[in-house]
Amino acid sequence: MDKEPITADGLESLKEELIFLKEKKRPQIVAAISEARSHGDLKENAEYHAAKEEQSHNEGRITEINDIIARANVIDVTKMSNDGKVIFGSTVDLENLDTGEKITYKIVGKDEADLQKKLIFFQSPIGRGLIGKNKNDLVEIKTPAGVKNFEIKDVKYV
């Protein structure tokens, strides 16, 4: 079982989701199954089948989270001295040299990556292009949308 890097925040989020799924959602689903079962014939009971499917998804996610937590290698960058180098868990302020757009990404593990929240998987094209670079470096990153040029404006360990 290979260890997977995860930030302290990412691990905490997974633990919170696990508690929610076990203590809140699981009892709600059991109640929905019980309610649907009381309606009679289970073969043509859409409510029952929908609740059972939701139960399957919920239990699958619980298993998945337990596996992620078991494999977690927590990296807490707040306990490291910041030398301006982009590392796993660091927050990076960038300027797109082609458009002038400023953007901030946090470099994270695969199980916590979320582009909408600007959480970038360290093995993604952008993550690989930034890891090991330093504040004020100019970087050229090959993305699916083409080559992008950035300047690293700041690197924070938060």
Curated annotation (Swiss-Prot):
Necessary for efficient RNA polymerase transcription elongation past template-encoded arresting sites. The arresting sites in DNA have the property of trapping a certain fraction of elongating RNA polymerases that pass through, resulting in locked ternary complexes. Cleavage of the nascent transcript by cleavage factors such as GreA or GreB allows the resumption of elongation from the new 3'terminus. GreA releases sequences of 2 to 3 nucleotides. Gene3D superfamilies: Transcription elongation factor, GreA/GreB, C-terminal domain, Transcription elongation factor, GreA/GreB, N-terminal domain. Transmembrane segments: none annotated. PROSITE patterns: GREAB_1. The keyword Transcription applies. GO terms for molecular function: DNA binding; RNA polymerase binding. The keyword Transcription applies. This is Transcription elongation factor GreA. Keywords: DNA-binding, Transcription, Transcription regulation. It holds the Pfam family GreA_GreB_N. The gene is greA. GO terms for biological process: DNA-templated transcription elongation; regulation of DNA-templated transcription elongation. Belongs to the GreA/GreB family. It comes from Pelagibacter ubique (strain HTCC1062). PANTHER family: TRANSCRIPTION ELONGATION FACTOR GREA (PTHR30437:SF4).
